[in-house]
Amino acid sequence: MELLAALNLEPIFQLTFVGLIMVAGPVVIFLLAFRGGDL
């Protein structure tokens, strides 16, 4: 637990959250286009 406590988790969570948004955006658009939905 000492190693985890030494790391600053806030920037890691922020980078992970931004990464998920950047990945989820194109995925949602691809799924809508794959289903033939009009944007």
Curated annotation (Swiss-Prot):
Q: One GO cellular component from the entry?
A: plasma membrane-derived thylakoid membrane
Keyword Membrane belongs to the record: yes
Going by the UniProt record, its keywords in alphabetical order are: Membrane, Photosynthesis, Photosystem II, Thylakoid, Transmembrane, Transmembrane helix
Q: List the GO biological process terms.
A: photosynthesis
Pfam families xrefs? PSII_Ycf12
Specify the protein's topology with respect to the membrane: Single-pass membrane protein
Q: Does the keyword Ubl conjugation apply?
A: no
Q: In which compartments does the protein localize?
A: Cellular thylakoid membrane
**Annotated TM spans:** 12-32
Q: How does it assemble?
A: PSII is composed of 1 copy each of membrane proteins PsbA, PsbB, PsbC, PsbD, PsbE, PsbF, PsbH, PsbI, PsbJ, PsbK, PsbL, PsbM, PsbT, PsbX, PsbY, PsbZ, Psb30/Ycf12, peripheral proteins PsbO, CyanoQ (PsbQ), PsbU, PsbV and a large number of cofactors. It forms dimeric complexes.
The UniProt similarity line reads: Belongs to the Psb30/Ycf12 family.
Q: What does this protein do?
A: A core subunit of photosystem II (PSII), probably helps stabilize the reaction center.
Provide the protein name: Photosystem II reaction center protein Psb30
Gene symbol? Answer: psb30
